[in-house]
A protein has these predicted regions:
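Concave beta-strand-loop units of leucine-rich repeat
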Residues: 2-98, 102-209
Length: 209
């Protein structure tokens, strides 16, 4: 199934400031950016010329990047952008997500249709990460790599109408002490009843959906 480009982020509270999905294409720069100091949001895609997408390094106030069907070179390049606060990655096959672990100021993370990797532990380096949206992570079924992510307040895990995201168990919730919103979409629960007992450890939980 191709990506829906709908906006499924919970816009209540301060969990998300990332632009809606459908707006990503408006931020692709296939031209020379004149006012680089004013640029805060950009989208990078494999369809861009190198001299165009590399302008990300010349925008000192850049806060948000969408990697839409990117090349491996583009993905590795953003490791240098340690000041960005928001990252969306869509349509990419990665052996690991170590490149995300270098983005120490990241607050919001969206991974959509990102396959090939299984280990989520690089995210533990992100001590400011407050919101995560996972959608269609083909090789991931164990979410224990999130344990210890104390800054996390919002977590959404989803599949699609034609593929349910497997979740081995929910023990990882015990390691998310500040989680306020826990949201599930199309998933397969691989644990027998009562699978959701770990949710009782979430003392700050405000919403389940």
């Amino acid at each position: 199934m191709k990506h829906h480009f709908g906006d499924f982020l919970d816009r209540t509270g301060d969990y998300w400031t990332t632009i809606p999905n459908r707006e990503r294409f408006a931020f692709i720069a296939d031209f020379e950016i004149v006012n680089k100091d004013e640029v805060k949001i950009l989208t990078i895609s494999k369809t861009q010329d190198k001299n165009h997408w590399e302008q990300i390094f010349d925008c000192p106030n850049l806060e948000e990047i969408t990697l839409h069907d990117p090349t491996k070179e583009q993905v590795q390049a953003i490791r240098r952008l340690t000041n960005i606060k928001r990252l969306r990655v869509t349509f990419f096959r990665a052996t690991d997500i170590e490149f995300i672990g270098d983005l120490h100021n990241l607050e919001e993370l969206i991974l959509e249709y990102v396959s090939g990797f299984t280990d989520l532990t690089p995210l533990l380096k992100l001590t400011k990460l407050k919101s995560i949206h996972f959608e269609n992570l083909r090789r991931v079924s164990n979410f224990d790599g999130l344990r210890g992510l104390d800054s996390l307040r919002y977590l959404h895990i989803d599949g699609t109408v034609d593929w349910n995201q497997p979740i081995e168990n929910f023990d990882f919730l015990k390691g998310l002490p500040n989680l306020e919103v826990f949201s599930l979409g199309f998933i397969i629960n691989k644990t027998e009843f009562p699978a959701f007992l770990p949710i009782l450890h979430l003392k700050k939980l405000k919403k389940i959906k």
